[in-house]
């Protein structure tokens, strides 16, 4: 018989680095009632984290204020009670701030909490680490992927041959699909952004310019392996797979394409329409909408 009393990390860094932090405890091995052997302990290692304490405080306060303002200004929506912030050092790519709300105090679990309190935290989502587990459509920040694609592959709106070429963004674009997709898409800015090139389109967040790129991809490559060129660029930037941060239970997010829609039609038919992957899905994808999801750390 051996006696081994261990403190086990249940979540976060403590769980990820459990073996390093815990070390090896002293073990007393008995044979009957006699001590047969004492195995000396090995102390756990220290770990150094990259979080900036002051920035962490500022980020937490900012997120709380942002959620409060959102709730004050959008009365018709459900209450916003969840949020995440991730800040990376642009030179080292280390996480210098990470906030997930709602949260909880792990010290309360040292002596145990009531089932009622546990259920309240669980229902509120306090045990979720939203920076790495929350999966949401990334929205217009995804246009950076399309920008990179356009630069590298020289794929521009129809009629343009360089990044300096301009289109007239009038606020909507008619696609003329014959596959059942939506025919007219309206930009977020009524009336459009005027004459824009690639640089201006990312600065102004012009949907129409990027829809034009998606339309060219669809017309040139539909049904070929190159049809998913945008998705491949997204995956090369880390979308659709874990970031490999040293935290447990990281989500992957989703980068949708024709093959995934075919898989879903069998395994999760409620997620897709019977027609499968259409041109309109690519239009949604290029502006970070539709079936695509990403975690905050992937976006960061």
Q: At which residue positions do the language-model features occur?
A:
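Small/polar-residue-rich segments within soluble enzyme cores
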Residues: 1-44
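Amphipathic, well-packed alpha-helical segments that form the structural scaffold of globular domains
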Residues: 18, 22-25, 33, 60-68, ...
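N-terminal leader/targeting segments and the immediately adjacent pre-domain N-terminus
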Residues: 22, 43-67, 100
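Beta-lactam-recognizing serine transpeptidase/beta-lactamase-like catalytic domain environment
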Residues: 26-42, 51, 77, 83-86, ...
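Beta-lactamase-like hydrolase cores
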Residues: 57-84, 103
């Amino acid at each position: 018989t051996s006696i081994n009393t261990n403190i086990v990390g249940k979540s976060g860094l403590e769980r990820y680095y459990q073996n390093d932090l815990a070390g090896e405890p002293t073990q007393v091995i008995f044979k009957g009632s006699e001590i047969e052997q004492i195995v000396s302990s090995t102390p756990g290692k220290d770990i150094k984290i990259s979080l900036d304490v002051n920035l962490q405080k500022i980020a937490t306060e900012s997120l709380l204020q942002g959620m409060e303002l959102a709730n004050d200004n959008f009365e018709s929506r459900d209450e916003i009670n969840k949020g995440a912030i991730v800040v990376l050092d642009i030179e080292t790519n280390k996480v210098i701030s990470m906030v997930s709300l709602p949260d909880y105090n792990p010290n309360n679990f040292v002596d145990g909490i009531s089932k009622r309190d546990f259920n309240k935290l669980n229902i509120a989502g306090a045990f979720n680490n939203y920076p790495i587990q929350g999966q949401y459509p990334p929205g217009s920040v995804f246009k950076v992927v399309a920008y990179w694609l356009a630069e590298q592959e020289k794929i521009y709106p129809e009629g343009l041959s360089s990044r300096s070429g301009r289109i007239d963004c009038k606020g909507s674009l008619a696609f003329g699909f014959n596959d059942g997709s939506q025919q007219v898409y309206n930009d977020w800015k009524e009336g459009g952004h005027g004459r824009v090139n690639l640089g201006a389109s990312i600065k102004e967040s012009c949907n129409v310019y990027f829809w034009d790129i998606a339309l060219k991809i669809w017309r040139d490559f539909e049904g070929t392996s190159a049809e998913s060129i945008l998705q491949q660029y997204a995956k090369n930037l880390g979308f659709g797979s874990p970031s490999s941060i040293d935290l447990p239970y990281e989500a992957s997010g989703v980068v949708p394409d024709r093959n995934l829609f075919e898989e879903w039609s069998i395994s999760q038919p409620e997620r897709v329409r019977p027609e499968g992957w259409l041109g309109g899905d690519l239009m949604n994808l290029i502006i970070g909408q539709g079936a695509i999801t990403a975690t905050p750390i992937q976006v960061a």
